[in-house]
């Protein structure tokens, strides 16, 4: 479990403001819970499951603040085969995000399944030279800073999706 509280103040002193200054204050809170388990299915085969759940909120002094609150669930399921020369892992990450706002339009819920696969092969049993390869498809939603901070936020931002390929060797 984790709790995070962050506070930011932006003071802009300029004659363009009626009072001669713009004083914005932002408060973000995050509550975070995580649980995981590992089960050995056979000699070289294991199964893991993990759940992360967090709640984020943003308050600020700007009259147009929508006061967003985001609920996020990340569920991962992974299977791994591992012997002295080969490690193969495949996983699936389920992401579910729902957001509420006190003002303005509520963003759509976001749901996504993100697969990943990785292989590592020890070429010679008496040397630690390995060939490896991996594939990952990932999804990231914009942060509250990206969406709601005055002058830099954009509520029309869409989630990012990336596909990652990696091939390499280690010794």
Annotated model-derived regions:
Residues 1-171:
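Outer-membrane beta-barrel proteins, especially TonB-dependent receptors
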């Amino acid at each position: 479990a984790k709790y995070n509280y962050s506070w930011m103040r932006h003071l802009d002193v300029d004659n363009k403001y009626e009072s001669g200054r713009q004083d914005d204050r932002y408060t973000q809170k995050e509550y975070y819970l995580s649980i995981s388990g590992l089960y050995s299915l056979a000699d070289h085969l294991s199964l893991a499951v993990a759940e992360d759940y967090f709640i984020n909120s943003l308050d600020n002094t700007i009259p147009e603040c929508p006061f967003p609150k985001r609920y996020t669930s990340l569920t991962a399921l992974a299977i791994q085969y591992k012997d002295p020369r080969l490690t193969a892992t495949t996983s699936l990450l389920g992401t579910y995000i729902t957001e509420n706002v006190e003002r303005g339009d509520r963003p759509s819920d976001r749901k996504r399944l993100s697969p990943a696969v990785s292989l590592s092969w020890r070429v010679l049993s008496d040397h630690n030279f390995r060939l490896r390869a991996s594939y990952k498809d990932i999804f990231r939603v914009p942060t509250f800073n990206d969406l709601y901070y005055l002058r830099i936020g954009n509520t029309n931002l869409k989630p990012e999706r990336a596909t990652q390929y990696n091939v390499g060797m280690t010794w």
